[in-house]
Amino acid sequence: MTHLLITGARGQLGSDLVARATSAGLPVTGFGSRELDVTDADAVDRALAGFAHDAKGDDVSGTAVVINASAYTAVDAAETDVDAAYAVNESGPAHLARSAARYGIGFIHVSTDYVFPGEGTRPYEIDDPTGPKSVYGASKLAGERAVLATYPEAHVVRTTWVWGATGGNFVKTMAILEASKPTITVVDDQRGTPTYAADLAAGLLELATHPAPGPGGVLHLTNSGETTWFGFARAIFTELGADPERVQPTTTDKFPRPAPRPAYSVMSPAAWVAAGLTPLRSWQDALSAAFAAAPEVFRPAPAGV
């Protein structure tokens, strides 16, 4: 049996990883930032030593895997909070990878489309040149490199446009705006793939429990298909039972931000599929399924509640 340790367990992806692992009957330990500061090398080493000991003591034939879902994700704030971004996104993964290698634990590190320049016209493959345009992207790329330099058998899994039931995200923001504004404008010149955190968690657990053959390295995992933020917003309005025409297109230059956003973030699943792993369903099917299963999660609470 696979024993799991999830870092960033209180976040959008981490909470779904813990929930999915629990429902699958897998032994799982979840650490949020309060329980484990990934930037503290000694704390990380103690945590992973204890995890390895407990996992091997419980099941001598089992395996132990750490999935790192912790990250500094404040893209704009990272432009000025550089040291903090690198501490969490580079040093943290390096500490985890080093201790995982030391104790014979599998390691999966979650990364991002922001490592690419965002100027492509076809889905990015795992070996396409990187070239981040923001501090956030550069810190995540530094983390990828630190992980694989320290622990070549580890897996780095890049994803994009993640949304889910936990915390704030684009879907919940659109629901709030739908309830409060007659019309909204959303950029139509940034293209990517909305990825449902629950689906992403399922894919990562498949990788953890049925490792890809061969050495470690980079993989891409997103829902399938592509759209723009404008197209995604209109699909959300449709799921809310609202008129999608209330969403109007605009361009990125109308919304200047401290950190540049990639114009193109679509990533190819070819390496994931070639490894014998299951591709994720379309982003449209994931959105519809999420609303059908728990519509109240993605709708703003009535005033006064």
Please describe what each predicted stretch is.
Residues 7, 31, 69-70, 107-113, ...:
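SDR active-site strand-loop-helix element
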Residues 148-192, 198-199, 205:
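NAD(P)-dependent short-chain dehydrogenase/reductase
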Residues 41-90, 99:
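NAD(P)H-binding glycine-rich loop region in Rossmannoid oxidoreductase-like domains
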Residues 80, 87, 91-95, 102, ...:
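Catalytic helix-loop patch of NAD(P)-dependent Rossmann-fold dehydrogenases
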Residues 29-42:
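Rossmann-fold cofactor-recognition segment
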Residues 2-22:
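N-terminal Rossmann NAD(P)H-binding glycine-rich loop of SDR-like oxidoreductase domains
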Residues 2, 282-305:
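Amphipathic terminal alpha-helices
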Residues 203, 210-259, 294, 298-305:
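Mid/C-terminal beta-alpha module of Rossmann-like enzyme folds, strongest
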